[in-house]
Amino acid sequence: MNSNWQKFISINPDIRFGKPTIVGTRICVSDILSWLASGMSFEEICLDFPELNKEHILAALAFAANRENITKIVAA
């Protein structure tokens, strides 16, 4: 999985209320995760949102995985 997600994900309070987004877009990590969960393929997402590519989707997954690990550490 993409370990360099930091170069693709930004958090800015002025964009989408501070939700993590793909740099240069208003597309949230949670949007990408929802599309994947609904059954969309990487290719379908990239066709529907040409500003995204496979690296962006992998970065969103890596960000979510990293966030899950942080939550586990804090909860422990």
Which role does the model predict for each range below?
Residues M1-S3, C46:
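A generic structural signal for short, solvent-exposed coil/turn residues
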Residues S3-M40:
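A short, structured beta-strand/loop element
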Residues C28-A76:
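Long, charge-rich, low-complexity alpha-helical segments
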